[in-house]
């Protein structure tokens, strides 16, 4: 019985540790070139009005540009960092730039947000 408990405890610890690891960015080829995508293959974007480590996309902006949310126990790496939004939620940033998806991208590989708002939104590129 104690061996089973020890095995279950070890497995729980391993699974908990792996869920807290850093977001691993994936890349995809689009009609506008290679870009970072989320787990669903949706294009990720950066916003020129954000400063390093700070998201200014709140309210209606955040409704149209959902943040790439990080778990409370997310662990950053050298390139992938965690930014705390004004609403207290955590989001991922690549090299200090907060990452977002775009509401009007409906299928994996869509790039409708690139160049939006007079060029203030950009596909996040490797």
Label every model-predicted segment.
Residues 5, 16-22:
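Sec/Tat signal peptide C-region and signal peptidase I cleavage site
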Residues 21-126:
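Compact beta-sheet-dominated domain cores in extracellular/mature segments
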Residues 1-8:
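Bacterial N-terminal signal peptides that target proteins for export
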